[in-house]
């Protein structure tokens, strides 16, 4: 009897203890920790809204963003009030380094160039934030830390060296020729016509990355990237919801579809990778695509360490990097291209200057790698497009342990956000024409335009700078050169200016342009 009572009271004690521990953790998570971090940030002179239970600023930010996007904006490149209105408001109210509440986590917004440079250069002391929902979309180099990141960066670097890009240039050309032919087929007998170029440019960049990621497995690669595009749309539609506690455990139709896509993509990539591995083991020549170069680099790493497979990437690692090829290779380049065409439509003098240079170098011949590197006007235009419409609107890092930036002490548990677009549109940093299209500012290069300050980083910066930026810029130069050779273009009266922040800044209502064939 006494033994039974002892067991009974023991169970009650354990249950009560576990209940108290769980209650404490929940209380700390939803209230005590956020309020403690808020107090510490305010002591550093940083200000923002007071913490609100669980959701923080999410609800207000969502409502303001929805209102800002409720109708097209005027034809202007001052897009910040439309794409990040809430962050803009916080900076206006609270000064240069305010904080915003991403649910229960305070996110410190840094807008001072020296602090931003410090953050981006301290890779080993800061982490990439881990949002569960993004696991559906990508893994690989972008989320790795420490030694694993260093190893993957080293192995992938072989695929993005300039001599490798030179080999890939003809496949860029093939994809561009296909797109130009499709555009020509839509023109009327007088050589003019209206099209929405946005879907075409998305297909172009998807085509390019499919050819250059998977080579002979191009068709299967294209199907995978179509699935990735659908997954990206689902992720962004549910991003705010995913920050609500326990959201991922709710069995919705969207959740089921995201899991289905993830499973399909992973199994398809495994099939392609295993097929390529078998071909390489059989002595077949390595294909000069990103997958082939990555696998060859991986095999070399294993051989250099006495055939120790633990020193290379696992199959799961390679799958993750292949997913990343899409995100890096498709999203950023397609948006760069669409905004380039929109801006050149609005500024015909720059369109003509770029066309004259392209025709001077190539005439009616197809662009090649050597000729693209001789262009001066077009790179200036692309740099300015990336300044006004950067692929990523900001960079986020997680503070895992207390750290100091300049004179500012930032406590562990805070996220640091670097708003690329705010810096690149800042009148104090770029002059009174900061929100206007003026490629002339890059006439003597990026360093001269920025006066050596860290105020321009469309592809990120520091050790984690995007390693695919040369791939993206080469593709953009090839595509725009061919478009200029073949078409004059201007905005259609039906064009609605609707910059929209999805994964990147995209034209929500498309990009309707009138094309006119250039006479041979």
Swiss-Prot record:
Q: Which InterPro entries match?
A: Cyt_P450, Cyt_P450_CS, Cyt_P450_E_grp-I, Cyt_P450_sf, Cytochrome_P450_Monooxygen
Q: Which residues cross the membrane?
A: 4-24
The main enzyme category here is oxidoreductase
Q: Where does heme bind?
A: 466
What Enzyme Commission number(s) apply to this enzyme?
Answer: 1.14.13.-
Top-level lineage group: Eukaryota
| Tagged with keyword Zinc | no
* Locations listed in the record: Membrane
What the entry lists under PANTHER family is as follows:
CYTOCHROME P450 72A11-RELATED, CYTOCHROME P450 FAMILY MEMBER
Q: Which family does it belong to?
A: Belongs to the cytochrome P450 family.
Q: What is this protein called?
A: Cytochrome P450 716A67
Name of the gene encoding the protein in the UniProt record? CYP72A67
